[in-house]
């Protein structure tokens, strides 16, 4: 398997890294941005659009760049490296991906073109209270009256739901899960935003006879498309976690070299360097799994199973690296003024977005029905 990047991909990484590095040069700069609404920097979002980043995975005919999952993964990793709060995965990979997969020509042109230009931010309203990352809807229903559709019910939490200009909403219609587009200023739509512990934003979204437009044509069940879109987003979040874990590890290694105890740097204590080495092993195991999963997405293979494997390994590595980064720093690691705690907080949030490690392990274990399934020689 070839995990190397070509010149264009390396150029993309350098450009995105430079932009986000300037926007979030220090942790104080990020704290100022996430302290106010909408929780990310609109100017940085616009600059990403100018670079073509927001249209990367979409077809050129829809206003995009026609790139693939590898390019998307590069952007996600650089976002994680500096904890940039811009909703790239939520808006581009998840909500935008569903519109690209299922939308009519007119819907794709309207939503994806504006998203690529940076003038529209979509969000996927799917999670419901009491559910655990299922691809089906239950609490929101869609009813048709005279050719018009209206939604009733509650979605919570909806990442970036309070800021979104348009919502892609899953709802029950005719006994199956379907998808609808709802404008941010629609009648009967109430959104209550809140700040998450990692500084990102989510919202409670209530529909009270809210006008909606079916996404795409046909009346079939869309839960399969939802599951595939969620899997792609899990892989992208895996790359965001890789960027965050790498920064946490690098920061910890630098601290061990600079901080002195008993007159010598902490890096001279073998027990501490062994712990840092174990962090590196966890990072590289996660990196290999997530990069492999990205190639599965690129080849349109079994995306769901690959995403579960990537999520499990990323979950384990995130917990290990986040915990050790704080432990090896000592008390300063949990202060708001120092960045390591913020990286651990974001890694914890990613671990619970769209399914945590225990959930992924249970799904993988449920797919094992015979010894041959796990026998590499079979």
Regions found by a protein language model. Give the residues of each.
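Short glycine/proline-enriched turns and hinge-like loops at secondary-structure junctions
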Residues: 67-68, 134-136, 160-164
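A structural signal for short hydrophobic beta-strand segments in well-ordered beta-sheet cores
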Residues: 140-142
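Flexible, small-/acidic-enriched active-site or ligand-binding loops
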Residues: 133, 137, 157-158, 183-218
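Short, flexible active-site-proximal loops enriched in glycine and acidic residues
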Residues: 82-91
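A short, Trp-centered hydrophobic/proline-enriched beta-strand micro-motif
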Residues: 118-129
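Short loop-to-beta-strand entry elements in the cores of soluble alpha/beta enzymes
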Residues: 90-99, 238-240
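A short core secondary-structure module
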Residues: 125, 152-189
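Alpha-helical interface subdomain recognition
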Residues: 1-83, 102-105, 118, 148, ...
């Amino acid at each position: 398997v070839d995990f190397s990047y070509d010149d264009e991909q390396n150029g993309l990484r350098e450009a995105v890294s430079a932009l986000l590095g300037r926007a979030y040069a220090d942790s104080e700069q990020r704290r100022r941005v996430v302290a106010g609404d909408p929780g990310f920097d609109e100017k940085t979002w616009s600059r990403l659009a100018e670079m073509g980043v927001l249209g990367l995975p979409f077809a050129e005919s829809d206003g995009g760049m026609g790139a693939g999952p590898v390019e998307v993964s590069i952007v996600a990793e650089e976002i994680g490296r500096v904890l940039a709060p811009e909703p790239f995965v939520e808006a581009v990979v998840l909500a935008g991906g569903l519109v690209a997969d299922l939308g009519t020509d007119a819907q794709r042109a309207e939503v994806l073109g504006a998203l690529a230009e940076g003038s529209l931010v979509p969000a996927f309203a799917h999670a419901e209270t009491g559910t655990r990352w299922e691809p089906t809807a239950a609490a929101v229903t869609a009813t048709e009256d005279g050719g018009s559709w209206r939604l009733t019910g509650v979605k919570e939490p909806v990442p970036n739901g309070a800021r979104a200009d348009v919502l892609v909403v899953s709802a029950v219609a005719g006994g199956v899960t379907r998808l609808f587009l709802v404008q941010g200023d629609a009648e009967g739509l109430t959104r209550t935003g809140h700040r998450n512990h990692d500084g990102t934003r989510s919202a409670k979204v209530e529909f009270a006879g809210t006008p909606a437009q079916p996404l795409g044509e046909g009346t079939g069940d869309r839960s399969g498309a939802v599951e595939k879109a969620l899997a792609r987003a899990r892989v992208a979040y895996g790359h965001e976690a890789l960027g965050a874990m790498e920064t946490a590890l690098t920061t910890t290694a630098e601290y061990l070299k600079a901080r002195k105890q008993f007159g010598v740097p902490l890096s001279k204590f073998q027990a501490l360097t062994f712990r840092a080495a174990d962090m590196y092993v966890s990072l590289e195991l996660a990196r290999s799994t997530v990069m492999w999963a990205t190639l599965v997405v690129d080849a349109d293979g079994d995306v769901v199973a690959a995403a579960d494997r990537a999520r499990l390994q990323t979950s384990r590595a995130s917990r290990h690296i986040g915990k050790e980064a704080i432990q090896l720093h000592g008390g300063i690691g949990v202060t708001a003024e120092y960045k390591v705690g913020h990286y651990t907080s974001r890694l914890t949030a990613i671990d619970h977005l769209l399914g945590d490690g225990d959930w992924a392990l249970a799904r993988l274990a449920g797919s094992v029905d015979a010894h041959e399934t796990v026998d590499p020689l079979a």
